[in-house]
Amino acid sequence: MRASSKKKVLVFDSGVGGLSVFQEIHRLLPHMDYLYLFDNEAYPYGELDQDVLITRVNKLVAALVEEHQADIVVIACNTASTIVLPSLRANLSIPVVGVVPAIKPASLLASQGVGLIATPATVTRQYTHELIRDFAQGKPVELLGSTRLVDMAEEKLRGESISLSELESILLPLRNKVDVAVLGCTHFPLIKEEIHQALGGEVTLVDSGEAIARRVKALLLNAMKQESREEGSKKIYASAPPWQEDALNTCLANLGFNPVQVYRLPGV
């Protein structure tokens, strides 16, 4: 990695959910330069063949890392993290940080039971069940997979209102069964307040954002001679023209980003 004072962080996701992870990292490291790429052309990742996903993510991330000389990559997507991290780490010479559902910290907090709210792909993946087996501390874990929650988070980011009654209906299987719930998709912290309300207001919600931010900070600051005190730049890219682009850009401006640029990579 470069020894300059200003480091570049590349955050990658299939949609805008990874912005919740970006916010946590930026809170700890406001003086870094940030690149955000969301692969909306292939969204949602849970429906992609595994080999296609591995090839696609490796090509996109490697190209952007080389073009912008990124110092660290954050895969802010649970589906991609469980499948692509080994190949990315083998192919890149910089650190790659992924997302893991926060089963262990949630289990330590729970007295009644743990709920895992994620995408259908995540709740059925063997990796997730291995996490539960190894880290659930003997606590019962209720699994709830929903793609609609992902869409709701995307809609909220574009200024649309969330139907609390619809949310309550989706989350009904967890009511009165858990006292801690894991937000197992990076989209879900974007609607954290609504989820908390829909679950009755007494369920503790846990996600991986803060832990990822601490990991990124540790890796970057160890490689820096001196931390910059100037506000970093923020650029955001999409692999296809985004849905409701004007509304999205309004929200992104509030986070300090310039308007979305379309990033096309031949052969992907």
Swiss-Prot record:
A Gene Ontology molecular function term of the record: glutamate racemase activity
Keywords: Cell shape, Cell wall biogenesis/degradation, Isomerase, Peptidoglycan synthesis
Protein's gene: murI
Protein name: Glutamate racemase
Database matches in Pfam families: Asp_Glu_race (PF01177)
Annotated substrate binding sites: D13, S14, Y45, G46, N78, T79, T186, H187
Reactions mediated catalytically: L-glutamate = D-glutamate
Entry's EC annotation: 5.1.1.3
Highest taxon listed in the record's lineage: Bacteria
Principal EC category: isomerase
Active-site residues from the entry: C77 (proton donor/acceptor), C185 (proton donor/acceptor)
Annotated family: Belongs to the aspartate/glutamate racemases family.
GO biological process: cell wall organization; peptidoglycan biosynthetic process; regulation of cell shape
